[in-house]
Every structure is written in C-alpha cells, then in structure tokens.
Amino acid sequence: SSDLVYVFSYTITVTNTGEVPAQLIARHWIITNELGHVEEVKGLGVVGRQPLLQPGESFEYSSGCQLRTPTGTMRGSYLCVNHEGETFECEIPLFVLQMNESGDPMPMPEKRVLH
C-alpha cells in the first residue's frame, strides 16, 4: 500500500438565515475516499470556536483533511442551538475533494445555502 497522503483544504461560510440568534456547537463530518473508505469526524465547534451568529451574520473558516486517494467527498452537519436553548441540525451537502491534472486543488465553483 502507498504511504502517499493527499491534503485538502476547504473554506466554509456559515450564515444565519433565520430570524433568531443561533450558535454553532458541534460538527459531524463523513469523509469518503475514492475507494469507499469512510472516516467520521465529530467534535465541538469549528477551528476551536463556537460562533454565535445573529440573524444575517456570517462566520467563515478554513480547515482541511487528509485522504489516501486523490479524490473523495465530504458531507455532514452542524449542531446548533437557538436563543431559547433548542438544538437543531444544519445539514452540509456533499462536496467533492479533488486534485486537477496539474496536481493543484480544484476551486470550489459554487456557494451552497444551508437552512
């Protein structure tokens, strides 16, 4: 087996599109490489933060992951809590981790709105 590791970075903007303040408490990622190997990652917050977002406010962060294949996918969810202490999940739609032919990361061409 190869010891080669592919390192991907991604930038995510989380926007509160609701009408009340909400805080991002935890994350849950499902990372799948092109061979079908699945890794789940769970933890509190994102990049060491648990941002509190007022309606219309955004929080942007960058992070990364490693795969043993040159392509893969990520999807998951954020656990959030509103101003009344009620928790809710925000689904993160699947996105592709991929190298282009020159070996550089592929740009993310689209923005996704999470409700």
Regions picked out by a protein language model, each given a short descriptive name:
Residues 33-36, 48-58, 97-107:
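Short, surface-exposed linear segments at secondary-structure transitions and domain or protein termini
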